[in-house]
């Protein structure tokens, strides 16, 4: 019994140490967005992109189109309902909820070799029209599958509107090595 307790304690302390070593990077806002040269590489690629708009009004529930036998009116929108509740979890007051409304971007990408990679999100917002903004996160010695999250929320979203066009770049040594963009990006 003592052995099991000791093993459990060792596992918890090891996982705590490993979690402390890899803090989640936070995006920094760029004041000036400089154009970069393009040198696309097969060593870097975007795997998947998840976009979510969390607005003040929840999406309307619709009846499932798969089966007429279902009596649950929200069955087709279950994942959207979960995403909304996930993003609003812990927001008690109306002010807390207002700071969570906005655009959420999750980019899943892969690096086949170790490299210092910067993930940059360039975007335009509804009320700012052609004004280009950017946020970026840098990963040292990145290799394998990675996930980068960006959130245009709170006052940025409430004052400037929703994101209407975006592109995400993987940058190595000042060169664009992979790109993912929205349909409206020029």
Regions found by a protein language model. Give the residues of each.
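Internal, hydrophobic beta-strand segments that form the core of beta-sheet-rich folds
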Residues: 162-176
């Amino acid at each position: 019994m003592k052995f099991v307790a000791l093993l459990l304690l060792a596992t918890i302390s090891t996982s705590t140490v490993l979690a402390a070593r890899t803090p989640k990077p936070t995006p920094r806002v760029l004041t000036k967005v400089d154009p970069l040269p393009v040198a696309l590489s097969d060593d870097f690629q975007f795997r998947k992109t998840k976009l979510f708009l969390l607005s003040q009004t929840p999406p309307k529930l619709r009846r499932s189109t798969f089966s007429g036998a279902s009596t649950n009116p929200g069955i087709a929108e279950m994942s959207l309902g979960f995403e909304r509740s996930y993003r609003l979890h812990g927001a008690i007051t109306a002010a807390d909820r207002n700071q969570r409304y906005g655009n959420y971007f999750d980019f899943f990408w892969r690096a086949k070799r170790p490299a210092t990679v910067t993930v940059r999100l360039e975007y335009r917002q509804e009320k700012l029209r052609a004004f280009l903004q950017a946020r970026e996160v840098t990963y040292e010695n990145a290799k394998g599958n990675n996930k980068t999250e960006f959130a245009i929320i709170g006052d940025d979203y409430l004052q400037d509107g929703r994101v209407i066009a975006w592109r995400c770049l993987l940058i190595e040594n000042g060169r664009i090595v992979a790109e993912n963009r929205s349909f409206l990006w020029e």
